[in-house]
Regions:
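Short, solvent-exposed loop/turn and secondary-structure capping segments
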Residues: 25, 30, 38-47, 80-81, ...
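Substrate-binding rim/cap in mid-to-C-terminal beta-strand-loop elements of soluble/periplasmic
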Residues: 52, 124-125, 160-281, 451, ...
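Active-site regions of oxyanion-processing enzymes, predominantly non-cytosolic
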Residues: 4-83, 112, 116, 121, ...
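C-terminal, low-complexity/hydrophilic appendages and adjacent surface loops
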Residues: 196-216, 289-350, 354
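Extracellular glycan-associated modules
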Residues: 373-556
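Core domains of carbohydrate- and sulfate-ester-processing enzymes
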Residues: 40-42, 47-94, 148-216, 304-321, ...
Length: 556
């Protein structure tokens, strides 16, 4: 199963159904694929298409892209290419195994993106079949930020390794090289590929203060209205400009009141003026950016922004993430985009007066646009609303499904106990409670009538504790109690199983998750949805075959 294909199938079906019901009525579709977010998955035949395509490495690929962009007229002929950041290794410095592994991770990325683009092409072909393609406005945005460097210098078999505090070894990665791009892994390429993908700009996703974190290509097609086909436009634009562009094209205004509620004014500026006026000055003169304490401001051709305070792969990492540099102590850069499209020449030291002007503008606009106060999540969560962080007791009954991690018991770095009141026997199987999935989590279930607790700390770090004997038929309270060795994220500890208060099994959990259990799956009662925490069962056969009265979780 691939989501991108399924989404395209549904989009095409919806469009055809709508046209069958009302062929003269226009339609609006917002189509947002999950790619190129991790995991980078694709069918095997698509993975095979890209074997050997990136053996030249990231330095050469970035240069090749830069030369091609110049030749095509996408960037100015006098553009300069910024150097590789010191935190990233040169391709030529890598070992043979590193090159083989890293190239394969990039092949999986390319295959996943190409497969997703193919599905978008199917959707456009379906519009063409209706005869309305020339009269259809299509806005194709390349991405929502810069390419992701969150795979770190060495890439990842599991993106969760970073957020759970797990270190992947080179030997482990090489042992799984043939699984890259498939369902067993949650793979992400090394950060240097992200740097190459962001050519000609420096930096990457998260760094909203720099061009590599915010600039993306965009294609607008509307053959009936746009006569300058294949031409480039360089006016400064922001994603908030898309909605006003669509509204102007349709000929309607954004409502000022919806169901009696006054609406905030639309920030965007229609890009319709660029359709026929290639040389028109940019209607958007100013834009503010902020993400994870990366501050940026654009004004009339000038771009000022902070330099990253930490690497992208450190931002979501488990462990101590306290900042040592405050918002007022950040180092800033300054670029004149009119003469330096690729932001290769930092003018911050040469023009401190202009930099100060831009910094003052940032703080003024931040106050106007509800960006203040700026509080990085690494500075702590005290005072933030949470449905689960401040609770120590949780009670669930059958039917509770996919409860978000923040609302579920916060077990990271803590001792905890699970008690399940059930009616079961020697033939009962299935999940009583599960949180997370294949790439991190825990599950308490019955297998052949025996209580089992499985803790999935990602990859090879899986731990199972099982009772020796099956249950007698009847009502029971089944318990799993984890005694942490210490109150710290990632702590090992001892897991003990109980049946009606009597210990029936015990074992060590060599490590626990240090960050999030799962950033994609929640807590389930009575079955395990989306993906299975334990290899002992599948999602399809995870349903509890006995009866559950309630499940209680207590945090100690």
């Amino acid at each position: 199963y691939f989501f991108e294909k399924d989404m395209a199938d549904h989009a095409i079906k919806w469009m055809r159904t709508q046209q069958a019901a009302a062929p003269d009525k226009p339609f609006f579709m917002y189509y947002a694929p999950g790619i190129a977010h991790t995991p980078h998955h694709a069918p095997k035949d698509w993975l095979d298409k890209f074997k050997g395509k990136f053996d030249q490495g990231w330095d050469k690929l970035r240069e090749e892209t830069f030369v091609r962009q110049k030749r095509m007229g996408i960037i100015p002929a006098n553009s300069q290419l910024s150097p590789r950041p010191a935190a990233l290794p040169a391709w030529d410095s890598l070992s043979a195994d590193q090159k083989k592994l890293y190239a394969r991770l990039m092949e999986a990325y390319a295959a996943s993106v190409s497969y997703s683009d193919f599905q978008t092409g199917r959707l456009i072909d379906a519009i063409r079949e209706t005869g309305e393609l020339d009269n259809t406005l299509i806005v194709y945005i390349q991405g929502d930020n810069g390419s992701s460097a969150e795979g770190g210098p060495e890439g990842l078999l599991y993106e969760q390794s970073t957020i759970t505090g797990r270190k992947e070894t080179m030997a482990e990665k090489m042992a799984h090289i043939d699984d890259i791009g498939g369902p067993k892994l949650y793979n992400h390429f090394p950060a240097a590929w992200a740097w190459a993908m962001n050519s000609p700009f420096p930096w990457w996703k998260q760094v909203a203060s720099q061009a590599g974190g915010v600039r993306n290509g965009m294609v607008v097609s509307w053959p009936k209205r746009i006569t300058d086909k294949g031409a480039f436009r360089s006016q400064y634009a922001h994603v908030s400009d898309i909605a006003p562009t669509v509204l102007e094209a349709v000929g309607i205004k954004s409502p000022e009141v919806v169901k009696g509620v006054p609406q905030k004014p639309v920030d965007g500026i229609s890009l319709g003026y660029t359709f026929q006026q290639g040389a028109a000055p940019s209607a958007r003169r100013m834009q503010i950016y902020e993400m994870m304490e990366n501050f940026g401001i654009y004004k009339d051709g000038w771009m000022a922004g902070t330099l990253p305070k930490r690497a992208a792969w450190e931002a979501g990492a488990a462990g101590d993430r306290k900042l040592t540099v405050g918002p007022d102590q950040r180092e800033w850069s300054l670029f004149n985009l009119d003469t330096d499209f690729t932001t290769a020449k930092d003018l911050a030291k040469k023009d401190p007066a202009k930099l100060k002007e831009m910094q003052d503008l940032f703080w003024a606009e931040a106050a106007k646009n509800n960006i203040l106060p700026i509080h990085d999540y690494s500075q702590g969560t005290q005072g933030r609303p949470s449905l689960g962080a401040y609770r120590t007791s949780f009670t669930y009954r059958p039917g509770a499904a996919t409860i978000a991690e923040d609302a579920a018991p916060h077990t990271i770095g803590k001792s905890f106990r699970i008690d399940a009141d059930v009616t079961a026997g020697s033939s009962t199987k299935g999940v009583m409670i599960a949180q997370g999935g294949r790439f991190g989590g825990y599950s308490f279930y019955l297998k052949d009538g025996k209580p089992v607790f499985h803790y999935n700390a990602v990859g090879a770090d899986n731990f199972t504790v099982a009772a020796d004997s099956a249950l007698a038929d009847g009502k029971h309270t089944l318990s799993a109690e984890f005694a942490a060795d210490k109150a710290a994220p990632g702590t090992p500890g001892t897991l003990t199983l109980y049946v009606d208060g009597k210990a029936v099994g015990s074992g060590r959990l060599g490590r626990t998750v240090a960050g999030w259990l799962s950033h994609t799956e929640g807590l389930d009662i009575g079955l395990d949805r989306i993906s299975a925490v334990s290899p002992d069962y599948s999602v399809q056969d995870s349903a509890f075959t006995g009866q559950i009265s309630e499940v209680r979780v207590s945090i100690k």
